[in-house]
Amino acid sequence: MASFTVGIVVFPGSNCDRDVSWALEGCLDIKTKFLWHESSDLNDVDSIVLPGGFSYGDYLRCGAIARFSPLINSLHDFIKSGRRVLGICNGFQILTESGFLPGALVANKNLNFICDDVDLNVITSKGGWFQKLNENQNIKLPIAHGEGCYHCDQDTLKRLVDNDLIALKYKTNPNGSTSDIAGITNEKGNVLGLMPHPERACDESIGGIDGLYTLRSLITQ
């Protein structure tokens, strides 16, 4: 996939950017490019990943400061053009803080940091994010977060359900998320935010390859 480039955004405090690059280049032969958060030129990338970590130290709230960066401002036109954006963990938090996805990520119900492999159900394949997977199919991905509890009001939940925007649900809810939600898409289907880490499940030697379904979807046209 030498002609296709995935941009990986790097904020102060990002710590999963190189993991994402390794997964895409090493496991899928997809070219990547690191994008410093102060950049606003996205013309030479075809898809974008907002990786996990602790952008700006997660001060105020997770993603609350990152949403003011020049690059996030440029995402408006990028998303409108139909190109794909994947937000993983802290990236999901940034997408909700920036208004690209509805709801919010708040502290886990038990107030503890959770690091574990979790079973998930694919609820919708809208936008082609889970290629070759059927709805309600089970996958296993790692989670690692302290503020991964997805919260939304009942009107928002109804909109998510009615418009088929819930991408993933936890089989056993680890953090208190509303309706067991682990990931959602926008209405156009080209933006996906999820708390689990697909880049940590892309090689059998590190526990599984279920993350490849999501990462491979970055090159869907």
UniProtKB/Swiss-Prot annotation:
A Pfam family of the record is GATase_5
The cross-references to InterPro entries, in alphabetical order and at most eight, read: Class_I_gatase-like, PRibForGlyAmidine_synth_PurQ
Keywords on record: ATP-binding, Cytoplasm, Glutamine amidotransferase, Hydrolase, Ligase, Nucleotide-binding, Purine biosynthesis
Q: What is its main location?
A: cytoplasm
- Write out the annotated subcellular location: Cytoplasm
Look up keyword Lipid biosynthesis and say if it applies.
no
* Pathway of action: Purine metabolism; IMP biosynthesis via de novo pathway; 5-amino-1-(5-phospho-D-ribosyl)imidazole from N(2)-formyl-N(1)-(5-phospho-D-ribosyl)glycinamide: step 1/2
What PROSITE patterns does the record tag this protein with?
A: GATASE_TYPE_1
**Biological process, per Gene Ontology:** 'de novo' IMP biosynthetic process
Reaction catalysed by this enzyme: N(2)-formyl-N(1)-(5-phospho-beta-D-ribosyl)glycinamide + L-glutamine + ATP + H2O = 2-formamido-N(1)-(5-O-phospho-beta-D-ribosyl)acetamidine + L-glutamate + ADP + phosphate + H(+); L-glutamine + H2O = L-glutamate + NH4(+)
Q: Report the superkingdom from the record.
A: Bacteria
EC number from the UniProt entry = 6.3.5.3, 3.5.1.2
Which Gene Ontology MF annotations are present?
Answer: ATP binding; glutaminase activity; phosphoribosylformylglycinamidine synthase activity
CDD domains xrefs: GATase1_FGAR_AT
The chain positions of domain Glutamine amidotransferase type-1 read: 5-221
> Where, by residue number, is the active site?
C89 (nucleophile), H197, E199
A GO term from the CC aspect: cytoplasm
Its quaternary organisation is:
Part of the FGAM synthase complex composed of 1 PurL, 1 PurQ and 2 PurS subunits.
Q: Function, please?
A: Part of the phosphoribosylformylglycinamidine synthase complex involved in the purines biosynthetic pathway. Catalyzes the ATP-dependent conversion of formylglycinamide ribonucleotide (FGAR) and glutamine to yield formylglycinamidine ribonucleotide (FGAM) and glutamate. The FGAM synthase complex is composed of three subunits. PurQ produces an ammonia molecule by converting glutamine to glutamate. PurL transfers the ammonia molecule to FGAR to form FGAM in an ATP-dependent manner.
NCBIfam families, A to Z:
FGAM_synth_I, PRK03619.1
Protein name as catalogued: Phosphoribosylformylglycinamidine synthase subunit PurQ
Q: Which organism is it from?
A: Prochlorococcus marinus subsp. pastoris (strain CCMP1986 / NIES-2087 / MED4)
Q: Which gene encodes it?
A: purQ
